[in-house]
A protein has these predicted regions:
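A structured, mid-to-C-terminal "fold-capping" secondary-structure block
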Residues: 81-177
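Mid-length scaffold segments of soluble, non-membrane domains
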Residues: 21-104
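Signal peptide-directed extracytoplasmic domains
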Residues: 1-35
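Short amphipathic alpha-helical segments, especially helix-boundary/capping motifs
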Residues: 5-9, 69, 139-143
């Protein structure tokens, strides 16, 4: 929390949102291919349209006119959901170091998403391991600085057992998707 709170105070919110938009745009293949794997062809088309609009009108993805001007909503599909569609049980709840809450199915899904992520391939061929980790950590801190502080506090503060509260919130959120 102290890292993203400090980052929050130094970087203006619009800059943080623009960085998030860029990372979301560049990682579009994850959601696009998972829509295809889930036979959600309309969703795949929506993802492709968002990518084209945001890459052109949105200045390389730093802006999100697909959402703000055209109301084209991101699909947010991942390989954990794809495995669930094909009847793989969610499995055990886990908290992965540096990655946060997950289930065994979603942890396996992270590997599938990594293969579909263009940043994985850029990291593999063009960056040193420490640069790749730095890139991932920067994206994570940027995301946390935008929307997790209040959410985490609102879940854990009133809870008798914060671990169970986060577990329950995570699993309920995944079931909705």
């Amino acid at each position: 929390k102290p890292i993203y709170t400090g980052y929050n105070s130094m970087i203006p919110v619009q800059a943080r949102v623009s960085v998030r938009n860029f990372y979301t745009n560049i990682t579009m293949p994850i959601s696009f291919f998972n829509c295809l794997f889930q036979s959600n062809f309309k969703g795949a088309g929506t993802e492709m349209l968002r990518f084209v609009v945001n890459s052109t009108i949105g200045v390389g993805g730093f802006l999100d006119p697909a959402k703000s001007r055209f109301n084209i909503i991101k699909q947010n599909r991942d390989f954990g959901q794809t495995l669930g569609k094909y009847k793989m049980e969610s499995g055990t709840y886990l908290v992965l170091p540096f990655l946060g809450p997950s289930t065994s199915r979603d942890a396996i899904g992270l590997a599938g998403d990594a293969v579909l992520n263009p940043l994985t391939w850029v990291s593999w061929f063009f960056l040193t391991p420490i640069e790749s980790i730095g890139n991932y950590m920067y994206d994570s801190v940027n995301d946390l600085s935008i929307d997790t502080g209040d959410t985490y506090e609102s879940i854990t503060k009133p809870a008798i057992d914060p671990y169970v509260a986060v577990q329950d919130a995570y699993i309920q959120n995944r079931v909705k998707k």
